[in-house]
Amino acid sequence: MKKIFIASDHAGYNLKNSIISKLKKITDLGPKTSDSVDYPDYARKLSKKVASNKGSFGILICGSGMGMAIAANKNKNIRAALCYSKKNTKLSRLHNNANIITCLLYTSDAADE
């Protein structure tokens, strides 16, 4: 069975826990609280797990999704993709063989600017 790992920064803590509650088999790599943390630490931790467990996948969550993707992609054998729609997520796997998806919390529109 393929392993799925998940991690976030403090901004993604609640979404991470929501995802965990919906999946039967997933390994939570932290953080364990919503206290402020450095996202690169969690991107590195998850990337190492995915790289060392052949066929596994990862989910990283932060405010923009970009920081986690950049940090994860610095690791060997990692292909992290920022996913913001069902189609984008599917294509990242089919065409780019992504083994980590990064999710964003913050979006922007004209009303927010």
Language-model regions, residue ranges each:
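A short, Lys/Arg-enriched amphipathic alpha-helix followed by its capping loop at the start of a domain
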Residues: S18-K25
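Short, acidic/small-residue loops that bind anionic groups at enzyme active sites
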Residues: N75-L104
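Short beta-strand segments
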Residues: A7, L60-G65, C83-Y84, T102-L104
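Glycine-rich oxoanion-binding loops at beta->alpha junctions
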Residues: D35-A51
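A short beta-strand-loop structural module common to alpha/beta enzyme folds
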Residues: I26-V37
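N-terminal beta1-alpha1 ligand-phosphate binding loop
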Residues: I4-N17
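Conserved small/polar residues in nucleotide/adenosyl-binding loops
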Residues: Y106-A111
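Helix-adjacent hinge/juxtasegments
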Residues: K48-A80
